[in-house]
Amino acid sequence: MTPVTPVPPQSPQQVKGLLSRFLTAPDRHPKLRYVYDIALIAISILCIVSIILWTQGSGLALFAIAPALAIGALGVTLLVSDLAESQKSKEIADTVAAVSLPFILTGTAAGLMFSAIAVGGGAVILANPLFLMGSMTLGFALMSLHRVTYQYLSNREQWKQQKKLEQVELAAWESHLPKESKSSALEEVRYSPRLMKRGKTWRKRAIRRKNYTPIPLVDKTLQTMQPDALFSSTTTHSTDSEQILTSVSPQSSDTESSSSSSFHTPPNSDKELSDSNSSDSSSSSEYMDALETVAAGDVSGITPPSKPSSSPKTTRRVVKLSRSERNAQHHRNKDQEQRQDSSESSEEDSSSDSSQKKKPSRK
């Protein structure tokens, strides 16, 4: 024989826990609401059919149809509220169900009591089952009024107040936002894909309307430019000028190597200018042509090609004068070196003569 394990008796707390779980199941699983609503409607239909078959259409038991009808009406109302898609329709269905339930129960209780009074009045009415059923239905109506209607309306007011508080808090939070978060929110709206397409078309139209002019390298002509600016611009073209000069004559490389410091030496006197002109006239015609081409290349690199200078002869003359000044300064430096060498040699000769005079003659 198999041993029979005794089943421990369930405590009232466990029963209460099971009942609460059964009643709160639709809250945890929303799809169970439809099952509960359909179950209420089915129970009410079964009650009505069974009462009619049992009484065969006559007798006091027909009054029990009233609670079945109330339960069926409650199930239909809850099912409509659950099937409603929009939030507003759900609120309307819930309100109708919460308000109509106590009235339905109260009407059922009143019908049962009046039927008991009609059958037999006096003290016997307290023992009539219709009266007892009516009083019980009236108690259910009062409980539904407190537990369903009043609680639903109070929760509805709390929900409205909570929504208002959330809106106020959201408005206050948006008003106290820092500028960076506001700018980021505006950028998110501004750089949306729809607005980006519009921005691209607007930019293209704006670019078509504008007339862009090329920015020249130097806005001033050679006459208005300072020597420092000319020096900085001529250094960029020094390599090209050196190649051209070396292909024409061997002397041109020496002159072009000193072109980087040409514009730093201002003219000293009219005498130096005349000397430089005489030295330039003594050079050959080919050498002068090469210098002119190199000078023209340097000037074209400085001034924009769209705006040629009004007096090209003066620009060439300025370049020639600067180079002639260089040559004159080179000659002056050579003369100074020769003078220093001659003075040093004369001092050495004088010192050697004095030493020879001081030596005694030996016979």
UniProtKB/Swiss-Prot annotation:
<feature type="transmembrane region" description="Helical">
    <location>
        <begin position="34"/>
        <end position="54"/>
    </location>
</feature>
<dbReference type="GO" id="GO:0005886">
    <property type="term" value="C:plasma membrane"/>
</dbReference>
<feature type="compositionally biased region" description="Basic and acidic residues">
    <location>
        <begin position="322"/>
        <end position="342"/>
    </location>
</feature>
<feature type="region of interest" description="Disordered">
    <location>
        <begin position="232"/>
        <end position="363"/>
    </location>
</feature>
<keyword id="KW-1003">Cell membrane</keyword>
<keyword id="KW-0472">Membrane</keyword>
<protein>
    <recommendedName>
        <fullName>Uncharacterized protein CT_005</fullName>
    </recommendedName>
</protein>
<feature type="compositionally biased region" description="Polar residues">
    <location>
        <begin position="232"/>
        <end position="245"/>
    </location>
</feature>
<dbReference type="Pfam" id="PF17461">
    <property type="entry name" value="DUF5423"/>
</dbReference>
<feature type="transmembrane region" description="Helical">
    <location>
        <begin position="91"/>
        <end position="111"/>
    </location>
</feature>
<keyword id="KW-1133">Transmembrane helix</keyword>
<feature type="transmembrane region" description="Helical">
    <location>
        <begin position="112"/>
        <end position="132"/>
    </location>
</feature>
<feature type="transmembrane region" description="Helical">
    <location>
        <begin position="60"/>
        <end position="80"/>
    </location>
</feature>
<keyword id="KW-0812">Transmembrane</keyword>
<dbReference type="GO" id="GO:0141213">
    <property type="term" value="P:symbiont-mediated generation of symbiont replication vacuole"/>
</dbReference>
<feature type="compositionally biased region" description="Low complexity">
    <location>
        <begin position="246"/>
        <end position="268"/>
    </location>
</feature>
<feature type="compositionally biased region" description="Low complexity">
    <location>
        <begin position="275"/>
        <end position="285"/>
    </location>
</feature>
<comment type="similarity">
    <text>Belongs to the chlamydial CPn_0443/CT_005/TC_0273 family.</text>
</comment>
<dbReference type="InterPro" id="IPR035355">
    <property type="entry name" value="DUF5423"/>
</dbReference>
